[in-house]
From Swiss-Prot:
<feature type="binding site">
    <location>
        <position position="124"/>
    </location>
    <ligand>
        <name>a divalent metal cation</name>
    </ligand>
</feature>
<keyword id="KW-0464">Manganese</keyword>
<dbReference type="GO" id="GO:0005737">
    <property type="term" value="C:cytoplasm"/>
</dbReference>
<dbReference type="GO" id="GO:0006298">
    <property type="term" value="P:mismatch repair"/>
</dbReference>
<comment type="similarity">
    <text>Belongs to the RNase HII family.</text>
</comment>
<dbReference type="InterPro" id="IPR024567">
    <property type="entry name" value="RNase_HII/HIII_dom"/>
</dbReference>
<protein>
    <recommendedName>
        <fullName>Ribonuclease HII</fullName>
        <ecNumber>3.1.26.4</ecNumber>
    </recommendedName>
</protein>
<dbReference type="InterPro" id="IPR022898">
    <property type="entry name" value="RNase_HII"/>
</dbReference>
<dbReference type="GO" id="GO:0043137">
    <property type="term" value="P:DNA replication, removal of RNA primer"/>
</dbReference>
<keyword id="KW-0378">Hydrolase</keyword>
<keyword id="KW-0255">Endonuclease</keyword>
<keyword id="KW-0963">Cytoplasm</keyword>
<feature type="binding site">
    <location>
        <position position="32"/>
    </location>
    <ligand>
        <name>a divalent metal cation</name>
    </ligand>
</feature>
<keyword id="KW-0540">Nuclease</keyword>
<dbReference type="InterPro" id="IPR001352">
    <property type="entry name" value="RNase_HII/HIII"/>
</dbReference>
<dbReference type="InterPro" id="IPR012337">
    <property type="entry name" value="RNaseH-like_sf"/>
</dbReference>
<keyword id="KW-0479">Metal-binding</keyword>
Length: 214
């Protein structure tokens, strides 16, 4: 499990009251994940508490942004957010727990790793991890809620960088191009070379590739 946290900062009551103008009594964090569908690599989650005193223009669902735009927003989010944490669940945890439960685990780690305790976690999707704070699921939240958009960007950029690192170790699969998703070239490499330690053996295409080399 990896976790990246913002430096701990003391929050005044005035600042806390402004985290979400529609919820003046709440400290709200947005939560999202990246990497549920790929055949390789960890699943990554992020939790973000935005600072309304330092607004960030251009936040959106990470999937609709270019890589260049995501990278630029990543730098702004880690600099201007009141608190953030990025966490992950490993390939072994995915294979042991299944991808859904591993995703919930990564989200839980991200929320619990925040340097400021939120009173509400808004989760992208239709279900929430078990948390020590109140949580609500918001379908398409990454396109609707700025803090969830910010979390989606941190999770996506972090995971893409992890897969570039994996490419350095296992160059035959092209992780730097497809980030572990089941593209035609990735599937062809799986059939030719078999899976590596970064592949999720609980996923059917990886199991099929294993069967070919047995």
């Amino acid at each position: 499990m990896t976790a990246i946290r913002a430096p701990r900062r003391r929050a005044s009551s005035d600042v806390q009251g402004g985290f979400d103008f529609s919820r003046p009594d709440e400290i709200v964090c947005g939560v999202d994940e990246a990497g549920r569908g790929p055949l390789a690599g960890p699943v990554v989650a992020a939790a973000v508490i935005l600072d309304p005193a330092q607004p960030i223009d251009g936040l959106d669902d990470s999937k609709v942004l270019s890589a260049k735009k995501r990278d630029a927003l990543y730098d702004l989010i880690v600099t201007r957010s009141h608190a953030y944490c990025v966490a992950s669940a490993s390939v072994d945890e995915i294979d042991t727990l299944n991808i859904l439960h591993a995703t919930m685990l990564a989200m839980k780690r991200a929320v619990e790793g925040l340097s400021v305790l939120p009173t509400l976690a808004q989760i992208d999707g239709n279900r929430c991890p078990t948390l020590s704070v109140r949580a609500e699921a918001i379908v398409s939240g990454d396109a609707l809620v700025p803090s969830i958009s910010a979390a989606s960007i941190l999770a996506k950029v972090t995971r893409d960088r992890m897969l570039v690192d994996l490419h350095e170790r296992f160059p035959v699969y092209g992780f730097n191009v497809h980030a572990g998703y089941g593209t035609a070239k990735h599937l062809a490499a799986l059939r030719e070379h078999g899976p590596c330690e970064a592949h999720r053996r609980s996923f059917a295409p990886v199991r099929a590739a294993l069967d070919l080399i047995r």
